Amino acid sequence: MTAEPARAISVMNPWAWRIVAGLQVVVERTWKPSWRGVLWIHAGKDSDLSAPAELWPPAGRLVTSAIIGHVTLADVQGQPGAWRWVLTDPRQLAEPVTGVRGHPGLWLIDLPPGLSA
C-alpha cells in the first residue's frame, strides 16, 4: 500500500504560527479544496505586517520559509468566494524544517525521513 502524498499550504506569519499554535482554528480562502486530511503548514518568506502586535509569536519564535507544523483540514464551509476552512489537531514541530520554498494553493511536499503526522 502506497502512502498518500503529504500536502502543504504556504501561509504568511503571524497566521502560520497562530494556526500551528492552535490559536487560529478557522481560515478564510476564496477557493474550496475537495481534499480533507493532514495539512502541513509552511510559514512563507513574507509576513503580514498589518497584523496587530498582539497576534505575533513571542520573540525568537518567528520562522520563515519553513514547515512549522501541521493541522487537520476537517471541514470547509461557506459559499463561492468566501470559504472557511475548519482546522483541528494543531501540532507544532519542535524543530521547523527550514529552507523550504512555498507554492500557491495546496502543494505536495516530500517530508524529510522520520517526519510524519
Give the location of each predicted region:
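Structured alpha/beta reader/binder surfaces that contact nucleic acids or chromatin modification marks
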Residues: 1-117
